[in-house]
């Protein structure tokens, strides 16, 4: 993470900059899925918006296993926003599959069983924002 936006050692931090080429973690069999998903999380410990901001890369054949974030569990009542940047994938729900391609966005509220699969020939790259849902 690079600090910048002012003199060499500013008294007040004005902004943070990060690269998706650094700090990548690998998650094999995420939620009992197939293959390994590469995840880059941004601004952990710095961001105050109440969200997690990640970039995920699923190689061909990789999946995030189906799972549910439960609204009755304060540690797991997440809402997830997916935005497809590159590649093609499939969002998997209990009784439906939804094709995803670059430019598509998907919002999954708590209590919805869901997963993700890359059935294409190239990496599937997704921006994922995870946060607690607000009041209706």
What are these model-derived regions, one by one?
Residues 1-55, 136:
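A short, N-terminal "cap"/entry segment at the start of jelly-roll beta-barrel domains
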Residues 47, 90, 110-135:
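Ligand-binding loop in jelly-roll beta-barrel domains
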Residues 95-110:
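Short acidic-glycine-tyrosine-enriched beta hairpin
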Residues 77-89:
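Glycine- and acidic-residue-biased ligand/ion/polar-headgroup-sensing regions
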Residues 41, 54-75:
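Conserved short histidine dyad/triad with adjacent acidic residue
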């Amino acid at each position: 993470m690079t600090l910048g936006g002012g003199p060499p050692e500013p008294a007040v931090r004005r902004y943070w900059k990060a690269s998706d080429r650094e700090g990548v973690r690998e998650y094999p069999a995420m939620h009992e899925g197939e293959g390994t998903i590469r995840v880059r999380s941004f601004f952990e410990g710095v961001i105050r918006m109440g969200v997690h901001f990640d970039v995920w890369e699923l190689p061909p054949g990789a999946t995030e296993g189906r799972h549910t974030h439960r609204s009755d569990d304060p540690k797991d009542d997440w809402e997830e926003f997916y935005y497809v940047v590159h590649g093609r994938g499939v969002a998997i729900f209990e009784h439906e599959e939804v094709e995803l391609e670059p430019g598509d966005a998907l919002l999954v509220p708590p209590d919805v069983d869901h997963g993700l699969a890359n059935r294409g020939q190239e990496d599937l790259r997704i921006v994922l924002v995870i946060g607690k849902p607000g009041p209706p």
